[in-house]
Amino acid sequence: MSSILVVTCLLTTIGLYFYNNPLSHGRWFMMRRFINWFPLGMTYAFLYMGRYNLNVCKNALGSLMTKEDFGLIFAAGTVTYALSFLVNGPLVDRIGGKKGIIIAAIGSSLANIVLGVLTYLVVTEQLKIKLVLAFSIVYAVNMYFQSYGAVSIIKVKAYWFHVRERGVFGAIFGTLISFGVYFAFDWGQAIVDMTKANLPSGETGWAQRAMQHLFASNVKPVDATWAVFFIPAAALLVWALLDWFFIKDTPEECDFPPFDTHDASSGQMHVKLSTMDLLKMVFTSRLMLIIAAIEFTSGVLRNGIMQWYTVFAHEVKQPGAEFFLGHWGLLLCIFGIIGGFAGGLISDKCFTSRRGPPAALLCGFMFVMAVLMAVFLKSNPFIVGSAAVLISMAVIGVHSLMSGTAAADFGGRKATATCSGLIDGFVYLGTGLQSFSLGYLTTRSWLWWPIFLIPFAAIGCVAAVVMWHELPAATRRYLNLIERKPEPFDPDPMSETPELEGVS
């Protein structure tokens, strides 16, 4: 049943993509753009599976990986991810998103293979080490390659989607994230369940027998938990091959005429930018730093819920709310898609592609939900589970608007990867902070979990209100001249992106 729902969501997303055509593109352009973003997006979804399979592994390993061990391992990876943009952002701006996503897929695949081998050796007692150090190192390598994924997908998107279409593409971006979370949690848990050493004979179907044949240990009859790393590794190699054949970095590579997306690079595509120019643009832009601050808070909230609810529900029984734990990945997938489309459609249809207003509304909503979690944590499991799912819905909307859309709008095609790298880096700095903090705090009391999240939702809301009226100057001109939708507020000087002018 869950697979049918996910396929339905995927088909609905594809249908909405073809339905939303505000610039009246030709049929072949729409089809070729779909052929471009679909394999790119599915690669990104499986990157998520190869990232959050650690969560499933932690629950399966039990005492071999404590909460504090898990917090340290995940934090090592997220801090690595956050700092990697200094290298891979400018690099992807130079080599293009196609090469970037292939680097991400192959690198993450190899790292997952090593994680699987480590798990196998430790669980079968052929290697006597504590998992925390070895996993921290290899997971950090995995996250370095993972960090190429977002900047690559947004780099390609920047050339193929006009600013007035990017809110909906941001929704597609959020949908792909949601599929990845579903793959990681629900498919990952299914893999763990099918590779248990002592399944009752009446419960072994062909899929279980195949998994046992492929992954069961000949050394010792133990659960083949390592399969949760090997399967996404194989999938990533397949998608890397498809990416090589199908993805084109720009419409011009498919023989379409030059396409002005009216973002911050409009009229500036001839300007050549060095790595230092790109980094200077990012770190001296007040607006980019505001967006980064919003994404820092979204990193705390997104992983503060997604990463810890399953740990909480395993540790503190939730009578009457078992449905949330049993279908966590599916719920994150469906509600993440809703959140992504809500944010994107509200931005494009109600606020002339301004990203601040829907982000502020969603952050305010998360604040209310986090307060509800704190109030009812010990008394009403259903409200806690519902609030957790709704926070996940809203935070995907914020993330797809900021990392998936605003970075490309205000960074422009020339600097998309560097800007989205900065912003995505702050997501994972926030993730690292919550991983360290909640790994420690929840060993004292689970009440600290929602209390820790509340101020970050408030900070994100305030920062989003600050950028309420922001639009790139080229977008503002497009609205005034083409759509006849004059913007009543003067643009902030940062939205003019003066950093591009005169740089050579």
For each feature predicted by the language model, list its residue ranges.
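C-terminal ends and interior cores of transmembrane alpha-helices
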Residues: 106-128, 364-378
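Cytoplasmic helix-loop-helix junction between adjacent transmembrane helices
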Residues: 138-175
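Helix-loop-helix hairpin linking two adjacent transmembrane segments in secondary transporters
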Residues: 173-249
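Extracytoplasmic gate region of multi-pass secondary transporters
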Residues: 51-58, 185, 285-341, 399, ...
